[in-house]
Amino acid sequence: MLRKVFYISDGTAITAEVFGHAVLSQFPVEFEALTIPFVETESKANEVKAQINDCFITTGERPLVFHSIVKAEIRDIIYSSEGLDYDFLNTFVAPLEQQLGISATPVVHRTHGNMNESYEARIDAINYAMDNDDGQTLKHIDKADLVLLGVSRCGKTPSSLYLSMQFGIKAANYPFVEDDMDNLKLPDALKKNKSKLFGLTIDPVRLHEIRQSRMENSRYSSLRQCRIEVKEVEMMYKRERIPFVNTTNHSVEEIATKILAMTGLERHMF
């Protein structure tokens, strides 16, 4: 039976999940996780406490409880459960109060709930990424913070969306396809925005595997075609002096982090 993990918050529980995943990923075992957001009342907290206690009785093991709860009265109820508590907010707030010389002013939903200008900027970035995905249009490319280039299925779309959702970066992306390979060059609209261009590449064998799952035994997915496209695109990157990274076996988070590090684009945290 897998060890039970609870992610609990009086907000979205995103913070508890992120911290909890980061910690648990250090251990080579699997866990069974349950996320419970918006625990905003004592009644709800007592329901969650009962779930934790029932889990302990059923499994004989204390559940791991990662939480980011602002209200002390709700937090105390979770503390009184049979779970092993990992309280991220309280762990860091008290030492910071000492260092800063001021008391914290806890507000529920402050981390991920602000409907302010920063939030609007993130929504604009997400809309931009979707409207300018896969070379749908180059009319608004001058408004991009970043333009990702690459062959089909190398990770352009997920990287663009992640950068927009996580960091508020307006990221367009443009594909190079089979028909481009005989005379591969940048469209004029991209040449005019060359400082914004960033390339993605991928191991041809891995690209072949990905394309096979999409269009099995087609010319598009053949290993030969994958090798041709990757080779031609990488040659163009070098010719045009476009920075690029290899996405093979890297998560979208890792790809985005490499892009930010290499481009120097400013992160906007929300």
Swiss-Prot record:
ADP binds at residues 150-157. Keywords: Kinase, Nucleotide-binding, Serine/threonine-protein kinase, Transferase. This is Putative phosphoenolpyruvate synthase regulatory protein. GO terms for molecular function: ADP binding; ATP binding; phosphotransferase activity, phosphate group as acceptor; protein serine/threonine kinase activity. It comes from the Bacteria. Pfam families: Kinase-PPPase (PF03618). InterPro entries: Kinase-pyrophosphorylase, PSRP. It comes from Shewanella woodyi (strain ATCC 51908 / MS32). It is an enzyme of class 2 (transferase).
